[in-house]
Regions:
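Conserved active-site beta-strand element of glycosyltransferases/polysaccharide synthases
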Residues: 162
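Terminal amphipathic alpha-helical/low-complexity segments used for targeting or macromolecular assembly
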Residues: 1-43, 49, 101-105, 125, ...
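Flexible glycine-rich beta->alpha loop in the catalytic core of nucleotide-sugar glycosyltransferases
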Residues: 82, 100, 150-151, 157
Length: 191
């Protein structure tokens, strides 16, 4: 009962005030970062310290947010997402953990319901560039970087840099590893 009341108070404060406060890095931010952090701790069951949820972020209340994680302005994060410690999510990033059903051609897609949630897991110290799309069921390994504007449709190993549509391997962050992706052969597709 106490958790439910706490969560409701957090939701009201966040949606009425927190979402509308200036960006966290603005010259005059009116304590926006600390206020949204306070709201996140009220709403989320698993929320680390020193998190930053920026302006106009929409997120599900089962979001798991690690210590020091940051979510940029205008992101949309659905149910079933975990963001590890020190994860950096750029502005306008969209995540999808399910989709519309489309199996029955005799029924409009909008009336067929949605598929089951396939969780997205983003590891520790991951940087996801602005305006990227992260699709259902994707796991992004620790230390990975996703280039801005990428569409991530499959798992990304730890300490690799991926980009493109669909996202593909660009380079490793590990010393001594192959540092660039080889050019695709004639007729071969990446991703």
């Amino acid at each position: 009962m106490k958790k439910t009341i706490k969560r409701r108070i957090g939701k009201i404060l966040y949606h009425v005030i927190g979402k509308r406060l200036p960006l966290s890095g603005a010259r005059v931010s009116f304590g926006a970062r600390k206020f949204r952090q306070f709201c996140a701790h009220l709403m989320l069951e698993d929320c680390g310290k020193w998190v930053n949820i920026d302006r106009n972020v929409t997120f599900a209340y089962d979001l798991k947010l690690g210590h020091g994680a940051g979510i940029g302005a205008n992101c949309q994060i659905p149910s079933g997402v975990t963001i590890g410690r020190q994860g950096m999510i750029g502005i306008d990033v969209l995540m999808f953990t399910n989709e519309h059903r489309h199996d029955d051609i005799t029924v409009p897609m909008g009336l067929q319901g949605r598929t089951e949630i396939e969780p997205i897991v983003i590891g520790d110290d991951v940087w996801i560039g602005s305006r990227s799309l992260i699709m259902k069921g994707v796991h992004i390994g620790n230390g990975a970087i996703i280039a801005a504007g990428s569409v991530v449709t499959k798992d990304v190993p730890a300490y690799e840099i991926w980009g493109g549509n669909p996202a593909h391997f660009l380079k490793s962050r590990l010393p001594g590893a192959e540092q660039t992706a080889s050019a695709p052969k004639e007729g071969e597709r990446r991703g």
